[in-house]
Curated annotation (Swiss-Prot):
Mn(2+) binds at residues 201, 220, 257. ATP binds at residues 201, 220, 236-244, 285, 322, 447. PANTHER family: PHOSPHOENOLPYRUVATE CARBOXYKINASE (ATP) (PTHR30031:SF0), PHOSPHOENOLPYRUVATE CARBOXYKINASE ATP (PTHR30031). This is Phosphoenolpyruvate carboxykinase (ATP). The gene is pckA. SUPFAM superfamilies: PEP carboxykinase N-terminal domain (SSF68923), PEP carboxykinase-like (SSF53795).
Length: 536
């Protein structure tokens, strides 16, 4: 076997059964991985110097093909209602067959770290058969100093072989695509998909399993910090504005997607960003756009024209086009990936029913209720001409990545909020003046003004009213914001229609939360919508 690059000779690939590979390239730089990717026909150079790769059949994650090994250690720890079990016997067969499949191949290795706080960091080795995958994960995770690579010992190993096709009958999986996580032994096997995001989210899943046992809260969120050290966390599902609203030139970006909250404060799990690029423009998101115009960035499934110029408006391959770049490509990004305890938590929702106010203050119990609910709404497909919104509840604002029961994360969050006196706000970036199809999108200018008032502390000093449907506190007036939009009912021409819509949304919340009723205390149960609170 040929070996290239700096690495620890005591932890070579032979130690995990990959000793039959033709060659291994350890910890290659971006420039070297560009050369390998292009030489091997995996990717193309864009006119601006980014690297464009296509993922073929899979242009997004495959959550139905993700499994967790169910063994003596994980049996009582995993939320099996939400995670698919795989027997140790099936995993052993899958591992043996994948290792055999790797024989004779050229492999790429990156030794990286998940977690910017030293005491809670996860040394992670990622083994790939694609050079561009190696660059992708090098961009996304935290890169150790070169000197540290000679003594690097991984606690998690990910083996990603897209050319391997699983056998459902033999391996206990669903299709030829498989993402199998052995949490006990720190091994993730990925086969049958070229979508690079599977590697990133596998690290997140493992951290979401390990950290709560250490009293550390893992979060699917973005985070930033102000000049006075006032950190803020932004929870929210896709399309709610998490990335856009946390990108604030007046504040330092800690990270855009995954963080932990420990006894020392918050810290990024990653060393890069994986941003959506569909309809990306220099005018709307200049910092993200600039990353797509430089060497080192990976563009995933972005259409190029004949001159190799990216066309970010073209979603013909997928709407889920992405770019992956290291954090330092963003001008105001944190160099440490860490900050103190958050002063503010923002929970974002895009309510397409037009019922929720643009901002509401949450008590710790209400914050846990809305965290466990993880609500947003998607608008129906225009091809069917349907204008009825579809409610989406993804617990902890990231159900696919949460191995443990949501109540574990919820109780941890509630405790941290109470202990550190964090101000919590629910922000609706969805519709006002009616539901989707009748109303209009919440003005981004108003959202930013409300957010600025919340982060500065100004919003805590205004007069509030209790929302008659959800019970949370809603500001009556805020400087610089049209007071009319603060009361959603008043923005509807047909008040009766609003009441009907509100009752419908409340009933959806109650039905969704039923599965958590037995796992929370009375205070959280009383935070449910429909529980009327005195108005003033």
């Amino acid at each position: 076997m040929e070996k290239f690059g700096v690495h620890n000779p005591a932890t070579e690939l032979a130690t995990v059964g990959l000793g039959s590979a033709a060659s291994v390239r350890y910890n290659f730089s971006a420039a070297a991985l560009y050369e390998e990717s292009i030489r091997r026909g995996e990717a193309e150079l864009t006119a601006q110097g980014a690297l464009r790769a296509l993922t073929g059949q899979h242009t997004g994650r495959s959550p139905r093909d993700k499994f967790v090994v169910r063994d003596a250690n994980t049996d009582g720890e995993i939320w099996w209602d939400n995670n698919k079990p795989l027997s140790p016997e099936h995993f052993a067969l899958l591992r043996a067959d994948m290792l055999a499949h790797a024989a004779g191949k050229d492999l790429f290795v990156q030794d990286l770290v998940g977690g910017a706080e030293e005491g809670h960091a996860l040394p992670t080795r990622v083994v790939t058969e694609f050079a561009w995958h190696s660059l992708f994960i090098r961009n996304l995770l935290i890169r150790p100093e070169t000197a540290a690579l000679a003594t690097f010992v991984p606690k998690l190993t990910i083996i990603d072989l897209p050319s391997f096709k699983a056998d459902p009958a033999r391996h206990g999986c669903r299709t030829e695509t498989v993402i199998a996580c052995d949490l006990t032994n720190g091994l993730v096997l990925i086969g049958g998909t070229s979508y690079a995001g599977e590697m990133k989210k596998s690290v997140f899943t493992v951290l979401n399993y390990l950290l709560p046992a250490k009293g550390v809260m893992p979060m699917h969120c973005s985070a930033n910090v102000g000049p006075d050290g006032d950190a803020a966390v932004f929870f929210g599902l896709s399309g709610t504005g998490k990335t856009t609203l946390s990108a604030d030139p007046a504040r330092t970006l800690i990270g855009d997607d995954e963080h932990g909250w420990s006894e020392n404060g918050i810290f990024n799990f990653e060393g890069g960003c994986y941003a959506k690029t569909i309809r990306l423009s220099a005018e709307a998101e200049p910092e993200i756009y600039a990353t797509t115009q430089r060497f080192g960035t990976v563009l995933e499934n972005v259409v190029l024209n004949e001159g190799r110029e990216p066309n970010f408006d073209d979603g013909s391959l997928t709407e889920n086009t992405r770019c992956a770049y290291p954090m330092h490509f963003i001008p105001n990004a944190s160099e440490t990936g860490r900050a103190g305890h958050p002063k503010t938590i923002i929970m974002l929702t895009a309510d397409a029913f037009g019922v929720m106010p643009p901002i509401a203050r949450l008590t710790p119990d209400q914050a846990m209720y809305h965290f466990l609910s993880g609500y947003t709404a998607k608008v129906a497909g225009t091809e069917k001409g349907v204008v009825e919104p579809e409610a989406t509840f993804s617990t902890c604002f990231g159900a696919p990545f949460m191995p443990r029961h949501p109540a574990e994360y919820g109780n941890l969050l509630k405790d941290l909020i109470s202990r550190h006196g964090v101000n919590c706000w629910l922000v609706n970036t969805g519709w006002t003046g009616g539901a989707y199809g009748t109303g209009k999108r919440m003005p981004i200018k108003a959202t930013r003004a409300l957010l600025a008032a919340a982060l500065s502390g100004e919003l805590g000093q205004v007069e509030f009213r209790a929302d008659p449907n959800f019970g949370f506190a809603v500001p009556v007036s805020v400087n610089g914001v049209d007071g009319g939009i603060l009361d959603p009912r008043s923005t509807w021409a047909d008040k009766t229609a609003y009441d009907v819509q509100a009752e419908k949304l409340v009933s959806m919340f109650i039905a969704n939360f039923a599965k958590f009723e037995d796992h929370v205390d009375g205070g959280v149960r009383d935070a449910a919508p429909g529980v009327k609170v005195a108005a003033e």
